[in-house]
């Protein structure tokens, strides 16, 4: 018998980026205390992120808290450069959402999780730890990053 967890990803509207947008960073994170967090930021050519970046926090009781781009901060703390594509990807982050009392440190379980298909993406597993409302929190998740090799159109 085999058991475990899996992830099914169905993406809609990849081509919906504005002309000044180059790609996105998407985080799907599940914590051992029963909470979950989804965040995405759409990156622009000048290094900024759009106001359309957003997220959702799901509390342990199932309550949902929508997050706007102004509610969270994602800071890259380490990077990895692919020998294959030459792209440099973030592989460790600090995430802060002061509004809900959440601070996280996360890192890729392994640096090379680049997918070289018709578009080159970095998609991979991450581990996280931090504090939620003053209590320790940890979990696992999945991160998808696009537009580091070529702008998505």
What are these language model-derived features?
Residues 1-153:
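Structured soluble/peripheral alpha/beta segments that form catalytic or ligand/cofactor-binding pockets
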């Amino acid at each position: 018998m085999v058991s475990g967890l899996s992830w099914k990803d169905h993406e809609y509207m990849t081509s919906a980026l504005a002309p000044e947008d180059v790609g996105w960073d998407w985080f799907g994170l599940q914590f051992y205390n029963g909470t979950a967090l989804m965040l995405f930021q759409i990156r622009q050519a000048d290094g900024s992120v759009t106001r359309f970046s957003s997220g959702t926090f799901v509390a342990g009781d199932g309550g949902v808290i929508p997050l706007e781009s102004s509610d969270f901060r994602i800071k890259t703390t380490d990077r990895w450069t692919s020998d294959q594509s030459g792209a440099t990807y973030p592989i460790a982050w600090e995430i802060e959402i002061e509004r809900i009392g959440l601070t996280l440190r996360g890192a890729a379980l392994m640096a090379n999780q680049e997918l070289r298909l018709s578009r080159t993406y970095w998609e991979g597993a991450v581990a996280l730890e931090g504090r939620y409302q003053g209590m320790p929190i940890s979990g696992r998740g999945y991160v998808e990053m696009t537009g580091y090799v070529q702008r998505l159109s």
